[in-house]
Amino acid sequence: MKTLFNLTLLLVFSHPLFAQKVIREKIFSAKMKKEISTIIVTPDIKPHQQYKTVYILHGYSGNPERTLKQDIPDLQAKAKAYNTIYILPDGNYNSWYVDSPVDQKSQYKTFIGSELVRYIDEHYPTKAEKTSRGILGWSMGGFGSLYIGTSFPEAFGIVGSSCGALDFRTFNEDYNNYQVDKVLGPLSSLGSEYILSDNTDKMLNTGQYYILDCGINDFFISKNQSFHQDLLTKKVEHLYIESLGEHNTEYWSRALSNQLSLFENYFNHR
């Protein structure tokens, strides 16, 4: 059945009217027992060809439609130029991309790292291997990409974070303002699993490559700098970039575009 479905999909994509597409799907999560809105941006799909995939995680209060229109407005052009399929799941405004211990309807780590990857590989002509699959996000999505990427090292070969919210312990009152408590409970009982700097050992010997960037005027800059130092101390191979910019669309739109080109360079050398 899968072979027949994939053949049908390939024939549809090869039709001139379906050469390059922005596809909107409702993808069912068995873990959450609900459908998740997801946008898939494809290049010009050709018969008998398989494509790299990058999963893109939006920031707090964002959504895939905003990503296409504002955050990475040239994503369709990049899909065509890089021959890559981009997958944009809806992170539900404030999921923080975790498997919430307090809300069973918010299990986004499993959905994105396992269920969604499996669905995309079954329904699209992908290169179903970690060296052809990446995950990237900014702000809340920067945390999510590192958290999910390191939780599923067998799935993702390259992991990128732009202006990532990397340490909840520094949020203070913003821990509740940004609704982290809705998915992880009170800050006072935050588990070490959700503190990225406590888990850098798991980033060793995974065969993954990591890219982090942050604007020098971003309120998250100090934690990105300290996380970079943690990785250096542990000798975790990564690329760290600082440049002019604040925590806003102007910065991360530019930074994400740069990261996607670095992702392409990674894929081409594997």
Positions of the model-derived regions?
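Bacterial Sec-dependent N-terminal signal peptides
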Residues: 1-22
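Non-catalytic cap/lid and distal C-terminal segments of serine-dependent acyl enzymes
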Residues: 20-270
